[in-house]
């Protein structure tokens, strides 16, 4: 889709505040769900959304082609800043979301914070091990181990879900599109 609005510096190559406002409006549900999967808290997910929008609009120029992925990255960065998942002990579990949520998402929400962040960033969003490591502030090995634990947990949940006729795979597409 070609945008006709030109950024303040005169170059149509960069996304404008209006472009980001449109993206956050059009993708509100997906961006909020991304924040919710990361924070497991409705208020924090909303805060990620609001701060992500504000930082996208007021932040450094971004190429227009990158604006949608940049919006998603801002949500992830806000969630990391709020939750500090690499500092959370692996044995501490987050209180479950009390909202009405897709039952198939519960397995993701039940992951420990670092596992959940790595799963969402690496598997759903396509970040590399290195990107996850840098953004989360932990070693690459910690990312690899967290991914392994997350996939094992989700595989077990999928087996249980299969017994009940539920599947996780279709749910992941809600977030990753």
What are these language model-derived features?
Residues 28, 33-36, 46-89, 97:
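Σ70-family region 2.3-2.4 aromatic/basic alpha-helix that recognizes the −10 promoter
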Residues 2-33, 116:
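A short, charge-rich alpha-helical start-of-domain segment used by transcription regulators
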Residues 9, 102-112, 139, 154:
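Short amphipathic alpha-helical boundary/capping segments
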Residues 52, 119, 132-133, 143:
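Hydrophobic positions on the alpha-helical face of helix-turn-helix-like DNA-binding modules
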Residues 86-109:
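Acidic, proline/glycine-rich intrinsically disordered inter-domain spacer in sigma factors
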């Amino acid at each position: 889709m070609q945008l006709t609005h030109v950024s303040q510096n005169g170059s149509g190559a960069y996304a404008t505040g209006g472009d980001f406002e449109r993206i956050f409006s059009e993708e509100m549900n997906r961006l909020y769900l991304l924040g919710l999967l990361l924070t497991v808290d409705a208020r924090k997910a909303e805060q990620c959304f609001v701060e992500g929008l504000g930082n996208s609009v007021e932040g450094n120029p971004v190429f227009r082609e990158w604006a949608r992925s940049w919006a998603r990255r801002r949500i992830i960065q806000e969630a990391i800043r709020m939750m500090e998942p690499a500092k959370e002990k692996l044995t501490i579990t987050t209180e479950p979301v009390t909202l009405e949520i897709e039952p198939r998402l519960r397995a993701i929400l039940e992951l420990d914070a670092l596992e959940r962040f790595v799963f969402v960033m690496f598997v759903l969003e396509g970040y590399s091990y290195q990107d996850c490591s840098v953004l989360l502030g932990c070693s690459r090995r910690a990312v690899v181990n967290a991914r392994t634990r997350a996939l094992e947990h989700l595989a077990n949940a999928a087996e249980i879900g299969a017994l009940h006729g539920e599947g996780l795979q279709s749910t992941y597409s809600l977030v990753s599109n």
